[in-house]
Each structure stands twice: as structure tokens, then as C-alpha cells.
Regions:
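Hydrophobic beta-strand positions
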Residues: 56, 129-130, 352
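Sec-dependent N-terminal signal peptides of Gram-positive bacterial secreted proteins and lipoproteins
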Residues: 2-30
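Penicillin-recognizing serine hydrolase domain
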Residues: 120-124, 226, 230-389
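Residue-level detector of high-confidence beta-strand sites
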Residues: 67, 106, 137-140
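Boundary regions of SH3-family modules and the immediately adjacent low-complexity/disordered segments
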Residues: 33-37, 97-117
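Beta-loop motif signature
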Residues: 30-95, 99
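Active-site-adjacent loops and short helices of periplasmic peptidoglycan-processing enzymes
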Residues: 117-279
């Protein structure tokens, strides 16, 4: 009986091995095999993707190098063409490479269309490049759609602070009331704070202005708003009134700092029914333009990399400034404001002036690569003749 069972086990194992071998042979027989019929050089020609379909392979087509959908705004330069045979069919393929030559290989010509790729930003959900001189957009992406803007909101707050200071040196030295238990608690919060408010200590308008601009301190921004208008609620009403006076139809504020009400309620500073400030990229750019026009000192103040304020280091997270990772001398960036909350994502308002060009203001909202995409956006803006000084 045992020997019979063993016999059947051996037969079953042989069947499985035979079946497995058959499957293996079948896969090998049906595997894609491309052979080269002819190859010729061609004049270097620019192409870009026709749609999201298609991929770049090695010439034997047994290794994928890149999918076109992951390179939505790339220009591919073709230098060779070949006729490749696959089974009974033949097709014309181009040997292409991106500008840097870091990605190259063969692709069926039908996946491409002649000409350089139109400019675009891959990550920013909303963006704009504005000519500061004319106030006209030179490039935009969903720029009229309002969305949360995090600490970029402080540009409006700082405008109203500078409006009240009105160049008066003595006003800068006025002491701001920072005794609120909510603001003191916020200043100690690792996620919502920034510049520490010490109980029984006094801070001037200038100190809180630097903390709000450079360190993006939320408690400093709220305290300044209360100093300007008398209360947090009145200041937010003033923010909205200012937006209305500028005809910003896609701007609505509920926060002086840019924090959402879902965070502010823990400190007693929630206001209104909406959760967040909702502003379009275009309206953010217009706020920045008004700020620079009326109070150009914001460029000098905003270009400071770091500053010790009342014994605390205020670090400017604008990494496009001189000496920082994303600095480019040709772009000459001298401002303006970063922002982040999980809801708003990474946001950045940049500005600079290239030699012989008008000043540019750029806005990218909810952009995980806010600095590299701002670099690209500024370069694109300067490529338009309308930006010439």
C-alpha cells in the first residue's frame, strides 16, 4: 500500500514538472522579440509626448527605461531612426534622449509629436507667474481657483501692519500685547507655534514683524493683527475688506496667520464658518504686488536669511535666497514667503528681477517641489519678450 502511494506521488510530481516545463517553454516562445531591420542617423529633431501612452525601451525591447506619463513636460531629441520587426509586424522607432541625456532609448514614433514640449509644472496644483510692472499673468495653471494657502496668508497681515506703521519709527517700537494664554500656548506648540512668547515679557511691533516674516510665527502674526485692529475678529474683517478694495474675487480670510480653524480652535482663535483661508494663486500674486509696490522695504526685510530677535533665532525658510540650496544668481530672488499646512501643502511666493527684465512674482500652491518648480517658472516667465525692461 505504501509503495502504491509512493508510485502515485512520483507520477504526480513528474506531471507537475512536465506541466511546469511546458509553461516555461510557452512563455519563452511567446516572449517579445524585436530585431533590427535597418538603422539610420537623422537630423536632431525635438519631439514631445502625444498622450500619456508609450514608453522608452532599449533597442532589444527587453528592458523598459521610462514611461512617457512620468515625463509630462519633457522635450525628447531624436538622433536616429530604425525599423524594428516584432513577429510579423514592422515599425519605425526613434532613438531619443532628454536635454541632459540622463534618459535615452528607443520609442515607437507614433507616441511622439514634433516640436518642443509646452511648458508645465508637474506638482503645483495652482500656479502663476506675474509681470510685476504690468500686473499681467505671463503663465498660469488653475490660477483662478481658490484654495488653502497656509502662511502665505501672512502677506496680507504684513501689508496691514506696514500700513499702520506708515514709516513711523516710533510706531515700530510700540509694545504689542502678547499676554493672551492662547497665544502663549500656541507659541509653545511644536506644530503651530514658532516665536516663543514668555509670560510677563514684552515684544515690540518690529520684533513680531520679523518673527512673522522670517520665522513665519503664527502667534506673532495673530498678535500683530490684534494690535492693528483691536481684536482678532476685527482684523480678519479688515483683511477681507482690503481684499475687496483690491477686487480680489477669489480671496476669503478666516485667519491672520494661515493656520486652519481646526488648529486655531484649541487656542481660542477660531473665526468664521470656513476652515481655512481660501485664495487663488492670482489673488496671492496681486497681494504680493500691492505689498511690494506700497512697501518696497519688504524685499530688503524678506531677503534676510536669519536674524536673532530678542534672543531667539528667526530662520527664513526661503531656500532660493543667496547662499541657500536653490539659489540661482541669474534669477536674483529677494523674497518673499513660504507656507505649509497638511491641508494646503507646500506653498511659495517668490519674486526677483533678472538683469534687463521686469520683476517677476511667482506663486505655487500645494507643490511638493516648490523651489525647483519656482526656478522653472521664473525661467519660463523671463523667456517671454513682454518681460523685457
Amino acid at each position: 500500500m505504501k509503495s502504491g502511494k509512493a508510485k502515485w506521488l512520483v507520477l504526480a510530481l513528474m506531471f507537475v514538472l512536465t506541466l511546469g516545463a511546458g509553461l516555461s517553454l510557452q512563455v519563452t516562445a511567446d516572449a517579445a522579440v524585436y530585431s533590427t531591420v535597418s538603422t539610420a542617423t537623422m537630423t536632431k529633431t525635438a519631439y514631445h509626448k502625444k498622450s500619456t501612452a508609450g514608453a522608452i525601451y532599449n533597442q532589444a525591447h527587453n528592458r523598459k527605461i521610462a514611461s512617457l506619463k512620468t515625463y509630462p513636460n519633457t522635450t525628447w531629441y531624436a538622433t536616429q531612426k530604425a525599423t524594428l520587426k516584432h513577429g510579423n509586424s514592422k515599425g519605425i522607432y526613434y532613438y531619443v534622449a532628454n536635454k541632459s541625456g540622463s534618459v535615452k532609448g528607443w520609442i515607437w514614433h507614433g507616441y511622439l509629436t514634433k516640436g518642443k514640449a509646452p511648458f508645465g509644472l508637474k506638482y503645483a496644483k495652482n500656479a502663476i507667474a506675474m509681470d510685476y510692472t504690468t500686473g499681467k499673468a505671463v503663465w498660469s495653471k488653475s490660477a483662478n481657483t481658490a484654495r488653502p494657502i497656509a502662511s502665505v496668508s501672512k502677506l496680507m497681515t504684513l501689508y496691514l501692519v506696514l500700513q499702520k506703521v506708515d514709516g513711523n519709527a516710533s510706531t515700530w517700537n510700540q509694545v504689542v500685547d502678547t499676554s493672551s494664554k492662547g497665544l502663549i500656548a500656541m507659541s509653545k506648540s511644536s506644530s503651530c507655534g514658532g516665536f516663543l512668547f514668555q509670560t510677563g515679557h514684552s515684544y515690540t511691533v518690529r520684533e513680531l514683524y520679523d518673527a512673522a516674516l522670517l520665522d513665519s510665527s503664527n502667534n506673532a502674526a495673530i498678535a500683530l493683527g490684534e494690535w492693528v485692529a483691536g481684536s482678532n475678529a476685527k482684523f480678519i474683517q479688515q483683511m477681507n475688506a482690503q481684499a475687496k478694495s483690491w477686487n480680489l474675487g477669489k480671496a476669503s480670510f478666516v485667519s491672520a496667520s494661515g493656520l486652519e480653524n481646526s488648529d486655531l480652535k484649541a487656542f481660542g482663535y477660531a473665526y468664521g464658518t470656513a476652515n481655512a483661508n481660501m485664495v487663488s494663486a492670482k489673488d496671492v500674486a496681486l497681494i504680493a504686488r500691492h505689498l511690494i509696490q506700497d512697501y518696497p522695504q519688504i524685499l530688503t526685510d524678506g531677503a534676510v536669511g536669519s536674524k536673532t530677535v530678542d534672543g531667539q533665532l528667526c530662520y527664513n525658510y526661503n531656500n532660493m535666497l543667496s547662499g541657500r540650496k536653490y539659489y540661482k544668481a541669474s534669477l536674483n530672488v529677494d523674497g518673499l514667503k513660504t507656507g505649509y499646512t497638511p491641508l494646503a501643502g507646500y506653498c511659495f511666493v517668490g519674486t526677483g528681477q533678472q538683469a534687463g527684465k521686469h520683476r517677476v512674482i511667482t506663486v505655487v500652491l500645494h507643490d511638493i517641489n516648490e523651489f525647483t518648480e519656482t526656478q522653472s517658472l521664473m525661467k519660463q516667465a523671463y523667456s517671454y519678450s513682454s518681460m523685457n525692461a
